[in-house]
A protein has these predicted regions:
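Amphipathic alpha-helical segments of tetratricopeptide repeats
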Residues: 77, 110-111, 149-150
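Alpha-helical segment of the N-proximal tetratricopeptide repeat
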Residues: 9-50, 54-60
Length: 181
């Protein structure tokens, strides 16, 4: 009696699942509840990388990019080579307009990506395309998109990103022609 079996979720586990569910609902009205739950999880386990990653996602979803950056830095301080953390750091830095730093973080995530994190590949490529495009590196953005489609051939997200990246690349190569009057 009173024994806990490994298969039984703890309060902490239930809180993280609740945060994931609330984030997954895509309803901004639920973000306050998600924030309360993730804060409670962090009170229980302040060194939890997963909780800090979720805190970053909640802050990002509410538009608080500085809080998202602080949360992801807390996660990366505890697990500096975690691909998901490096991805989120890149995404948040991109949102803050710090594109070169964002690109470095995304590239670092690619370098440490293992088979277990294959689910992250499509998002990494998409974020890389977005950042390269924001930097005005349209040829590189198109190439990254093509590489992403090669690795994730069924990606509707990358196919959707290819057209704007390609248009930006072509637009950048057009010359202004002076007409005679």
């Amino acid at each position: 009696m009173g024994e806990r079996y490994d298969s039984e979720p703890t309060v902490y586990d239930r809180l993280l699942d609740q945060v994931r569910e609330l984030l997954g609902a895509g309803d901004d009205a639920l973000l306050v509840e998600a924030n309360i739950a993730v804060n409670h999880a962090l009170q229980l386990h302040p060194d939890s990388v997963d909780a800090w990653l979720l805190k970053c996602q909640v802050a990002s979803a509410t538009g608080d990019d500085l809080a998202a950056l602080a949360a992801i830095e807390m996660a990366l301080r505890r697990s500096p080579h975690r691909p998901e953390g490096l991805y989120w750091r890149g995404a948040v830095l991109g949102d803050l307009g710090r594109h070169r730093e964002a690109l470095r973080s995304i590239e670092a995530a690619f370098r440490v990506l293992g088979d277990a994190e294959h689910w992250l590949l499509e998002d990494l490529f998409y974020e890389k395309v977005t950042i390269l495009d924001a930097l005005g590196l349209h040829d590189a953005a198109v190439a990254a998109c093509a590489a992403g489609l090669e690795r994730c051939p069924g990606s509707a997200l990358l196919r959707a990103a290819l057209a704007p990246a390609e248009r930006a690349r072509v637009r950048g190569s057009l010359k202004v022609l002076r007409g005679g009057a």
